[in-house]
Structures are given as C-alpha cells and as structure tokens.
Amino acid sequence: MYIIDIDIEHIFGTNIRDFRRLPMDYKIIAVDFDGTLCFSNWPELGVPNTRLIQYLQAQQAAGNKIILWTCRAGDALSSALDWCVEQGLCFDAINDNLPEIVELYGNNSRKITCDIYIDDRNMLPEAVC
C-alpha cells in the first residue's frame, strides 16, 4: 500500500478549480468510519486503519479539511468519535457540510460537498493509502 494523492485534474481532464467552482484553497475529504477508518462491523469498534489515519493527519497538517461521514448516530457515533480521538484524529465536521460550504451555497444540502470521498463501499481505502 502506498500513500498517494488523487490527481483529480488527470481524471477529469480539466483544472480542478474551474471544475469545482469552489473558492477554497484546500481540499475537503469525507471519510466513512466502519470498514474504512476502523476495521469493524457496526456497532463494534475494531482495529484502526493506521495508514489511512496517517494519510488524513498529513492532509490536515497540509491545511485540508476532513469530514467524518458515517451512518452512526447516538451512542454508536459517540463511541466512534472517542475512538478517533484515541487515534489522534479529529474532524472539521461530523455528518455535516463545512460551515463555509453552507454559507457559499446558502443551504445545507443532504449531499456532502467534498473533493474526495473515502468509503469501503465507494473508494477502497487502499486506493488512497
């Protein structure tokens, strides 16, 4: 496994700033919990995906924003957040768009606005790290 960054310009064949039309100077990365950050089956907590966690920490250190986007709610979400703190991972938003995105569009869409979405049912963690 390698830690890489996705070349969105190469994939879409255009300048990412023109494609997204977002005035952000950073990437927004949304990540799932179960099977992605944590190798577990809901509602249990399991082994951390340390390579992905290190990748996300490096992205935050570079100024990018991280959103936890999970189906967990209530106590299961609280347990997952505590687990993430134990791993040294914190989020800019949890199951929500960033405030600056809500302000930009004038509403809070149910669809998450992000540049990269990492989910075991969408993009395998191995594809980015």
Regions found by a protein language model. Name each.
Residues 3-129:
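HAD-like aspartate-dependent phosphatase fold
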